[in-house]
């Protein structure tokens, strides 16, 4: 047993024979035998030799025409029509052809175009969609990143569309399809105006001003000796009243300013021009207390300034020089001897001359 079948009951199929034409077409030999018999009968019924002789006799011999005889070639080929090559015109489309398959295809394309033109967008603007709760969401696809960029949720569709336009211009530039192209035109016009304003030439200052101003600019400084500014240290020998004996003249008769502190004299300034310039006399400062004199020459705190004391009473330098001679020792000795011809002043007279201001 093999697989539940009884081998003794298994009958093998007969051995297949070689495939021949007789096996495929068994009636072929019968047809061949019948055709041979019919051919014999036909040959007996028809005499092919007699028929050939009859046909040959019935054939007309055209050799009677002699080629040497004169004959007109035009008469022979007179009935022959020449060949004419003409283009056949295209058949006009009839009313029946309008209902054909070709006509149906054309009408179908036109109908699709009309449908696409009449079809409205689901949303009025591109790149936005409405949420179930009423707000509008905007998003755009970035081809460089290959992903969609979320732009946010907005209350109105117009705000969402403007956000989409801004992102589209940033990603695709001037080729972007936007919802508000007129804003793009306005932005381009504004950029052009800004560029035009930047390209306008700026007025440059005239490097050569009028010659009159150049000539008159140094009139007041032509006799000034500009030197390096230095802090002035007191070099003058002050007496017990804090005033100088005489006034020296500067170069060319002009006086130099060298005071580094504010002063209350008639022609002093806060500008220091030279170390070698003579010091202007602080005549009106004669009555100031010696304790305050340190403020004039204190280098540690040069920013302190005293209040200006202006006097209306005029004075004369020659009178001051003459009045101060009594302080010298020679003047005292001559005064004792009574040989000084000059009238000496006392301290009370000095106070009255100053005006009684201490």
From Swiss-Prot:
Q: Which residues bind DNA?
A: 124-181
Impact noted for substituting residue 2 to A: Increased lifetime of the protein and accumulation in the nucleus
Q: What is its main location?
A: membrane
Its tissue distribution reads: Highly expressed in seedlings, leaves, flowers, siliques and germinating seeds.
Task: List the keywords (alphabetical).
Answer: Activator, Cell membrane, DNA-binding, Ethylene signaling pathway, Membrane, Nucleus, Transcription, Transcription regulation
Compartments where found: Cell membrane; Nucleus
Q: What induces it?
A: Up-regulated by hypoxia but not by ethylene.
Q: Which GO terms describe its biological process?
A: detection of hypoxia; ethylene-activated signaling pathway; regulation of root development; response to hypoxia
Q: From which domain of life does this come? A: Eukaryota
The UniProt function text for this chain reads: Transcription factor involved in the activation of hypoxic gene expression and in ethylene response. Partially redundant with RAP2-2. Acts as a downstream regulator in the ethylene signaling pathway.
Other comment: The N-terminus qualifies RAP2-12 as candidate substrate of the N-end rule pathway for protein destabilization. The oxygen-dependent oxidation of Cys-2 prevents hypoxic gene expression via the destabilization of RAP2-12 in air. When the oxygen concentration decreases, Cys oxidation is prevented and an active RAP2.12 accumulates in the nucleus.
Share the domain note from the entry: The N-terminus (1-13) is important for the regulation of the oxygen-dependent activation of the transcription factor activity, an internal region (123-177) is required for the interactions with ACPB1 and ACPB2, while the C-terminus (343-358) is required for positive regulation of gene transcription.
Assembly and partners are described as: Interacts with ACBP1 and ACBP2.
Q: What is this protein called?
A: Ethylene-responsive transcription factor RAP2-12
Q: Which organism is it from?
A: Arabidopsis thaliana
